[in-house]
Amino acid sequence: IGIFFNFFINWITNVKNKFARKVLEFFTGIDKRAILPKYNKETFANYFQKFKKNILPKHKERKVVIYSTCFVNFNKKKTGEAALKVLHHNNVEVEHSYAGCCGMPYLEQADLDQVTKQAELVSRELIKYVEKGYKVVTLTASCGLMLKFEWPLLMPNDGIIKKLSQNTLDIDEYVMDIANKEGLVDGLKEIDGGVTVHNACHARAQNMGNKARDMLKLIPNIKLDVVERCAGHGGT
């Protein structure tokens, strides 16, 4: 619904639309000051299908399936576009899967039954790719944490969940794996100005190190600042 009516929903949820936000706050309890994510004009899933039709097939030794997550699929398609282009440029075969939410919002509300349902739904789809030799790449730190750690903690006897966890990587983690083994394709260029990267709590909880920082340091002469403080996700 958010995608189909994206213009209208983005308009009424804009903090500058004070009247609409007051009404929204009254009926939903969402603070009128909260900046809400905007909806894409199309899902990342739709974009991926068009991208795939327009690329030349070639043999690739590396294979990944992007789990785009709710946020990228519906709200931040450009993140998925960037990841897809970087992976394809570095000769990685890419597929896409989005069977549903990872369950993080339910976990934060202690609805463990619904988290379990989401884990079963998504894992049964992603495992099909893992069994074909694909790695699962996540584009959102919170969702990566769910697949790697929270699902296995909640369902320790589920073999599919365990195998999926062992074959899931954050996008920054995967790019650094390429850089450290085969090396990235030549062509990284300097960028104007500096870059600030936020090392999210859910990224740190994955015990992979600050891979976003390490990846950005590969850019020649990069001016990089790292923010370690919590963004307040737990307060949402």
Q: Which residue stretches match the model-derived regions?
A:
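Iron-sulfur cluster-binding electron-transfer modules in prokaryotic oxidoreductases
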Residues: 1-236
